[in-house]
Amino acid sequence: MSILPGFLLSFAIAIVSYLLNRFIFHSLGSATIAILLGIILGNLYFKQVTLFAGTAWSEKKLLEFSVMFLGATVTFQTIGKLGFSGVGFILIQMISTIIFVLFMGKKLGFSANVSALMASGNAVCGSSAIAAVEPVIGAETSEKRTSIAMVNLMGTILMLSLPFLGTWMFGNNDLLRGALIGGTEQSVGQVVASATMVNPNTTTLATLFKIMRIIMLVFVVLYFGFRSKKQKRNEQGPTQIKIKRNSFLPWYVLGFLVLCTLDTLIHFVPEVSATAKFLSGWCETIALAAIGLRLNLVEFIKAGKKLLIYGLSTLVFQVVLALILISLLIK
């Protein structure tokens, strides 16, 4: 199936979002307008099957390119602003989230697979983490679909609320607002969209916190693979689950690190950094339009009360813990 129809629709929404941001809604940002427009149009008008391949490609690939190009706009001196306290914040936040989500999943009666997918999606990077963990635990398609739907719903709520909560709690401190958004939001797109509602510096810092979480994906995949093997061995005897090597470290993280290293060592001329920022911004806006188009609100209504409790309790836990850790470690 051709990706062209879905891509062109996402691109058109990105163009409209850019114009709306430039001439009418100056404070929202093109990325935020794009995902909101996508949600509205996708749920009301654009449900054709011919669009699915293109919006799926735009959501995944363009967002990855956006993150990679961002590496040419920062240096390790920028990452150094996060410091050991920033790394400590991310590690404690991720480990605590995984423990809490697994605990709540068991208490609410969800399967071990759903709990693992929810834990990885909320702790690391949303749908991408769920897709990476799914094959190593042998999850069913229905379990993956349920987890992705809930993680995206909670991510959307956080995406729209964290900019205001961060400003209310931390004032104009971009580092702390970036830590809150980058340390709790589920997907890269939601991090960027949320931080864009604040300012460009917060977007950069939030993305750096998010990149640190993405780098931890390899360890999360290994952990859940080992955990699943142990559980199945206890239940069924010796078994073997293959872990896909290409699920470990996303290529766009490597690209980000390579470009960041080059910028640190040779210092890109302003034109190169400006071009990378331009490409990153447009890839991001088109991708977020696609994310909005693919967000099916009906799925969330069908999710059920118990799943909603699961998602909301995870959301509250993540935000409260992040606020406490940021105040203790970073502030």
Curated annotation (Swiss-Prot):
Pfam families linked: Cons_hypoth698
Keywords from UniProt, A to Z, are:
Cell membrane, Membrane, Transmembrane, Transmembrane helix
Q: Name one GO cellular component term.
A: plasma membrane
The subcellular localization recorded is: Cell membrane
In what way does this protein cross or attach to the membrane? Multi-pass membrane protein
Signal peptide boundaries? none
Q: Which InterPro entries does its entry note? A: UPF0324_pro
User: What are the TM regions of this chain, as residue ranges?
Assistant: 2-20, 24-46, 82-104, 114-136, 148-170, 204-226, 247-269, 308-330
Query: Can you tell me which family this protein belongs to?
Result: Belongs to the UPF0324 family.
Q: Which PANTHER family match?
A: INNER MEMBRANE PROTEIN YEIH-RELATED, UPF0324 MEMBRANE PROTEIN FN0533
Q: What is this protein called?
A: UPF0324 membrane protein YdhF
